[in-house]
UniProtKB/Swiss-Prot annotation:
The keyword Cytoplasm does not apply. It comes from the Bacteria. Coiled coil: none annotated. InterPro entries: HemC, Porphobilin_deaminase_cofac_BS, Porphobilin_deaminase_N, Porphobilinogen_deaminase_C, Porphobilinogen_deaminase_C_sf. Pathway: Porphyrin-containing compound metabolism; protoporphyrin-IX biosynthesis; coproporphyrinogen-III from 5-aminolevulinate: step 2/4. Monomer. Tetrapolymerization of the monopyrrole PBG into the hydroxymethylbilane pre-uroporphyrinogen in several discrete steps. One of its GO terms (biological process) is protoporphyrinogen IX biosynthetic process. The lineage of its organism: Bacteria, Bacillati, Actinomycetota, Rubrobacteria, Rubrobacterales. This is Porphobilinogen deaminase. Its cofactor is dipyrromethane.
């Protein structure tokens, strides 16, 4: 079938790099692809902390609306930004290749988390990162930061902080050579779906299977399925302090997860292994809730603006 596709994407350099990677795969499968930039809520409110934007789909809503309206044929998102429940009429056709999901600590000194000076300021807009960093280093001062990858690094270098936490996948995809340390997962577990790309299409699109064959990574799909099942069972979103990392191998999936209080004082963690990714995610969620995660998540929801 092939044919022409209009691919919707945010306009940031990272979003465009991710969209171009998917477009290349589609072109190799015989599609003609046009990229169309769409501004999302996050782009329109670049200086507002995510905690005050009362919207789970802050990075995806306008792309979803364009998809449902027929303005674009598919949309590419960072999987970590996609709510666990996608809008009616939209399906995730593919999980495109997953880069290293780890977080990176960017600083002029190239410090790791344990090497940061006492009381150092670390910039991040993520509650997940804040909570896990404070669990490891209660002395750190975590400061809010917004903007695309280049903007955050520039703000850090201008004196906003001694270091900034970014997804390592973003640095790699942008080809940025900056001093940084990859943060081990026993210090900072990634966001659900971090490093993977989500390809969304309209339900019933006759090209869905062709798009899937061109872009889907089965191992990444299994990993993401386990992580998103965990988050869904915890009734969380991108603004709750949940970290997860699934590793697919053979027929099984190993999933690790943590829920951490915003001040870092309390942490519930565990792991599960099994053959069915979503069942693994649900089992781990049940275990974490029994261990105290329910109280942490209830507190977080209660104190949000």
């Amino acid at each position: 079938m092939a044919g022409r596709l209009v691919l919707g994407t945010r306009g940031s350099p990272l979003a465009l790099a991710q969209a171009e990677a998917c477009a290349a795969g589609l072109r190799a499968a015989g599609f003609a692809v046009e990229l169309r930039r769409i501004r999302t809520t996050s782009d329109r409110r670049p200086d507002d902390p995510l905690s005050v934007i009362d919207q789970r789909d802050v990075f995806t809503r306008q792309l979803d609306e364009a998809l449902l309206a027929g303005e674009v044929d598919l949309a590419v998102h960072s999987m970590k930004d996609v709510p666990t429940e996608v809008p009616e009429g939209i399906v995730l056709a593919a999980v495109a290749g997953r880069a290293d999901p780890s977080d990176a600590l960017v600083s002029e000194g190239g410090w790791g988390v344990d090497g940061l000076p006492e009381g150092a300021r670390v910039a991040t807009s993520s509650l997940r990162r804040r909570a896990q960093l404070l669990h490891r280093r209660p002395d750190l001062r975590v400061v809010e930061i917004r903007g695309n990858v280049d903007t955050r690094i520039r703000k850090m270098r201008a004196g906003a902080a001694e270091a900034v936490v970014l997804a390592r996948a973003g640095l790699v995809r942008l080809g940025l050579e900056v001093p940084h340390a990859v943060i081990p997962h026993d210090v900072l577990l990634p966001a659900v779906g971090q490093g993977a790309l989500a390809v969304a299409v309209r339900r019933g699109d006759p090209r869905l299977e062709e798009i899937r064959r061109a872009l889907n990574d089965p191992a990444a799909e299994r990993e993401v399925a386990a992580e998103r099942a965990l988050l869904r069972a915890l009734e969380g979103g991108c603004r709750v302090p949940v970290g997860a990392r699934a590793v697919a191998g053979g027929r099984g999936v190993l999933l690790r997860g943590v829920v951490v209080s915003p001040d870092g004082a309390a942490l519930c963690g565990g792991e599960e292994r099994g053959e069915e990714p979503e069942e693994v995610g649900r089992r781990l969620a049940a275990r974490l809730l029994e261990r105290g995660a329910a109280g942490i998540l209830g507190f977080v929801r209660g104190v949000k603006p």
